[in-house]
Amino acid sequence: MTHLPVVSGFEMVKILTRFGWTPKIQTGSQYIMKKQGSTFRIVIPQHRELRPGIIHQIMKEADLSIEQITKYL
């Protein structure tokens, strides 16, 4: 199993953009990402390093694996 990478909020936004998510709103220190044809949205904090729990939650919401994340780093 691959280890969870250290990812910043901005890097996570770039990764999700490659999978069809687009940043719709930036409020305060958070990006709100949306995918076309979906009412679901993902909130990504603008931190230097996202905690492992936040990364796991974003991966679960976006239906991504660790391998898909590390491929685009």
Task: Briefly describe each language-model feature range.
Residues M1-L73:
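Basic nucleic-acid-binding interfaces
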